[in-house]
Amino acid sequence: MIPTLLNKQTLQLINRKQLKYSLVMAEKDYFLALALKVLEESKLYNKLVFKGGTAIHHCYLEQSRFSEDLDFTSLDKDLKATDVTDIFKSISFFEVKKVYTSKATIQIERLKYSGVLDQPNSLKFEIDFIQNVVLPPKQMKYTNVWGFDIMVNVMDIREIFAEKLRAMSDRARYRDFYDFYLISEQYNLDMIETINLVKQKEIRKPISKESILRNWKVVSEQKEEEINLIYYRQDIFNNEQGIEKLLKCLNFTTIS
């Protein structure tokens, strides 16, 4: 059953006591949970594997940072865009405004929501068809401060860790290094197994230790720019030497 919307006073109270986000960000966190509740009660639940930043921080790391996208890999390669958009049709507070499709993805680029703040806003809902899922997904609780009981079909943390390794090589984003470091701190993951998992997944371009270290240097020089864009519970640069040691200990040169 999809819950009714909370009022502004309750949003403010819960945010002040628990999240301490901006109110706009807190409302988005609330609608992320609602969108996943809609998914849980739909026919798509067992067809999509939840992954990415929102999955990490609501299933594995207890909201150590804010993440605003819903990312999935589809187990059903014949899934159509209408299969996805239809689950939101009967939900009064959601409106699908912009959809992009290709052989590689279905993206609801703007899943507009109408909340108590009366400010136009939207979520991004992205489904990947190219990236395979190697390990069996986990049935886990989506932790949230809003009191919703939500179960998700989420990617195994070992495979998420492997995807973060690839992401650090592909791009220079603080959030990737942040997630990789916190996962390595909280979970005793084997790096050899991680590299083997990377090799079993779709590799679109070579993954190299050199590019990871180069991207970390860029992130270190431009850290304030991204830190100011997204809420982070802690500053991993307080342990910058520990992160550099972790990255330099990566026991591979190139994966292709």
Regions found by a protein language model. Name each.
Residues F50-T54:
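Glycine-rich beta-strand-to-loop/alpha-helix junction loops that act as flexible
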